[in-house]
A protein has these predicted regions:
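Conserved PLP-binding catalytic core of the aspartate aminotransferase-like
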Residues: 434-464
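Conserved PLP cofactor-binding pocket of PLP-dependent enzymes
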Residues: 438, 443, 467-484
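Conserved PLP-enzyme active-site core in the AAT-like
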Residues: 190, 196-362
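PLP-dependent enzyme catalytic core of the Aspartate aminotransferase-like
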Residues: 44, 303, 477-513
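Active-site C-terminal subdomain of aminotransferase-like
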Residues: 328-431
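Short loop-beta-helix segment that forms the pyridoxal 5′-phosphate
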Residues: 169-196, 247-250
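N-terminal entrance/gating region of PLP-dependent enzymes' catalytic architecture
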Residues: 45-178, 499, 503-504
Length: 513
């Protein structure tokens, strides 16, 4: 082993070189202590804006100050108000000279930080909002520090790291190697990518090159689903298919949101062989109901359709032996959406999309500018999603998966499900409230025992938020206004669940009129 000290401009680099027999040596830079003297020469500093030069000379101190603010926030997130309902500050004019990073940090801490929600905390049960595990926060910080543009592989290992992470996630969700994947911003874009590939598949079946001729060349497209998320209709609008092309298929009776497979079969028969898109749901928003994926996939023996599965958070059922049966058949899908800033508990924004037809995906998203090059057998990520440029979103997920493994993330899922059942049992026992759907996984859907109007339900949600103890989101289920409490945060405990229940119980006479 050879240790040498080299200089890169004014910054020393300690390099450890390991001899590996006849192979080329492997060199790994070990960052030394930041130099006490400013790294910029006088000429360099003279050419740089004053505040930039000052921040560069004090970079370690600035990062330490930011670290201290973050550490205080994370240490107190359990007790800070879960939601802030007061008015935000008025806008200020754009600075001309700038204050420097330290002053900006102070201004943020004084002016804006107090009004940010406690959405990273354990009692933020609105929407389906995960927190950020300690390892994923560290990975997210380093994502910014290394500042990689992961869309292209040239000159960096960043794309290889993402491919490794996608492979781990594929294994985590029980998908076979036929599925390739890429990171995107969230479930909406993941669904959009999956449906874009489905649109290209329709063209393949109908003899139309959609990527060249446009969606209009397909004619009317049939999209069938039982209880789709609103992001599906948004995706259909973006893709030029049209929101109104989504055809609702009846669901099972008995307080269910899962599609009736017999009704789906009948709807496909009515198409007389015309290819279609079927959107199956692995975890509906209100009750976390699951379509019978295996039975839906079996319909492909008789009908021509692309099977897209929205498994934004329900896909995490695969992590638990107790609940994995709910996603049986997921591997048979042609494309799959999974959101990672929900139940994987990595910082916003992160999701992954999978598909069996990377060739069609590349046809849709390839960017063939001469300086970018043409797609290859293992195309760069800029050829797979709408983004040509993006950060290394995979790194926080890589950190969390490596730090806690599949067993650590399984524990989060199983604990959250147990806590959802605990809250559901408590709500069922509270006067004035009524459990409105069975607790199937991690969401509790409930409403008022009397007069569950939209106004009264919204008043309950606001009253709970005003206590600072919890945050819930209103919804409508089976035609009735209701509330949802979604458990997906790694921090949430029985004590947190009991505090949410106490906040509900503290409302006057159960509820405002």
């Amino acid at each position: 082993m050879l240790v040498t000290l080299r200089r890169n401009g004014d910054i020393p680099r300690l390099t450890v070189t390991v001899r590996t027999g006849g192979r080329a040596p492997l060199s790994s830079p070990v960052p030394p202590k930041w130099p006490d003297t400013p790294p910029a020469t006088a000429a360099y500093a003279a050419a740089m804006h004053r505040t930039l030069a000052d921040d560069l000379s004090r970079l370690p101190a600035l990062l330490q100050s930011a670290r201290d603010v973050a550490a205080r926030e994370l240490a107190g997130v359990d007790e800070r108000p879960v939601a802030r309902l007061d008015k935000a500050p008025d806008r200020e004019p754009l600075p001309v000279e700038g204050t420097g990073g330290e002053a900006a940090l102070t201004r943020f801490a004084e002016r804006w930080a107090p009004g940010l929600s406690g959405s990273a905390g354990p009692r933020y049960l609105g929407f389906v909002t995960g927190g950020a595990t300690p390892a994923s926060v560290a990975g997210d910080w380093l994502t910014s520090a290394y500042d990689q543009n992961v869309s292209g592989a040239a000159g960096s290992w960043a794309a290889a790291l993402e491919r490794e992470t996608v492979g781990w996630l594929r294994e985590l969700f029980g998908l076979g190697e036929a599925h390739s994947g890429a990171f995107v911003t969230g479930a909406t874009v993941s669904n959009t990518v999956g449906l874009a590939v489905a649109r290209e598949w329709l063209g393949e079946r109908l003899g139309v090159d959609v990527s060249r001729d446009g969606a209009a060349a397909l004619g009317p497209v049939d999209v069938l689903s039982g209880s789709p998320h609103s992001s599906i209709t948004k995706a259909l609008s973006v893709l030029g298919i049209g929101r109104d092309r989504l055809r609702s298929v009846p669901v099972l009776t008995g307080n269910r949101e899962a599609v009736d497979v017999d009704q789906l079969d009948a709807a496909l028969c009515e198409l007389n062989g015309r290819p279609a898109i079927v959107v199956a749901n692995a975890g509906t928003v209100n009750t976390v109901d699951f379509d019978d994926l295996r039975s839906i996939a079996a319909l492909k023996e008789r009908h021509a359709f692309w099977l897209h599965v929205d498994a934004a958070f329900g896909g995490f059922a695969a992590l638990s032996p107790t609940y994995a049966h709910l996603v049986d058949g997921l591997d048979a899908a042609d494309s799959v959406c999974v959101d990672l800033h929900k139940w994987l508990n990595v910082p916003y924004d992160a999701a992954v999309q999978f598909t069996r037809r990377r060739d069609l995906q590349t046809r849709v998203f390839h960017n063939a500018s001469p300086y970018l090059g043409l797609p290859t057998g293992d195309p760069d990520f800029l050829h797979l999603t709408p983004e040509n440029s993006r950060r290394l979103r995979a790194l926080p997920a890589w950190f969390s998966l490596l730090a806690y493994g599949s067993s650590g993330h399984r524990e989060i899922v199983e604990r959250n499900v147990a806590l959802a059942h605990r809250l559901g049992e408590g709500i069922a026992a509270l006067p004035g409230l009524r459990l409105w759907a069975p607790v199937r996984l991690n969401v509790v859907c409930f409403t008022l025992a009397e007069k569950p109007t939209q106004e009264r339900v919204a008043a309950v949600a606001e009253a709970v938020a005003a206590t600072g103890e919890a945050f819930l989101t209103p919804t409508v289920y089976d035609g009735t206004p209701a509330l949802r409490a979604a458990f997906s945060n790694w921090r949430t405990s029985e004590a947190d669940t009991d505090r949410v229940l106490a906040a509900l119980a503290s409302l006057p006479l159960g509820l405002p009129r």
